[in-house]
């Protein structure tokens, strides 16, 4: 009987630790996605989109941050 109780306790601890790891991964991934969305939003607001395929340029800037460029009338991550 004691072995059954200890086994169940170990399983509960293992699953709790695994759940915490998954939660931590979800937080990191959502922050990364939020950063990409912010950079894209920044690019869309700051860029003058060129029809001839030149790099997008903000006011006084050579490039958009985060690797974004204006291509095909869209702000794309390159």
UniProtKB/Swiss-Prot annotation:
Disulphides: 43-56, 47-70, 64-75
Pfam families tied to this protein: Toxin_20
Places the protein is found: Secreted
Tissue note: Expressed by the venom gland.
Keyword tags: Disulfide bond, Ion channel impairing toxin, Secreted, Signal, Toxin
Signal sequence bounds: 1-19
Primary location class: secreted
Propeptide: 20-40
Family: Belongs to the neurotoxin 12 (Hwtx-2) family. 05 (OAIP-5) subfamily.
The protein's name: Toxin OAIP 5
């Amino acid at each position: 009987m004691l072995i059954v109780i200890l086994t169940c306790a170990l399983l509960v601890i293992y699953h709790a630790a695994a759940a915490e790891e998954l939660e931590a991964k979800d937080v990191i991934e959502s922050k990364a996605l939020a950063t990409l969305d912010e950079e894209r939003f920044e690019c869309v607001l700051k860029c003058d989109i060129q029809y001839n395929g030149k790099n997008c340029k903000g006011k006084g800037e050579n490039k958009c941050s985060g690797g974004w460029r204006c291509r095909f009338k869209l702000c794309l991550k390159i």
